């Protein structure tokens, strides 16, 4: 999901 993707990008 989008939230999970943003987490990855945040790291």
Swiss-Prot record:
Cellular-component GO terms for this entry: extracellular region
Domain of life: Eukaryota
Subcellular location: Secreted, Cell wall
Major site of localization recorded for this protein: secreted
Keywords: Cell wall, Secreted
Record's protein name: Unknown protein 2
UniProt source species: Ephedra distachya (Joint-fir)
């Amino acid at each position: 999901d989008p939230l999970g993707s943003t987490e990855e990008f945040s790291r």
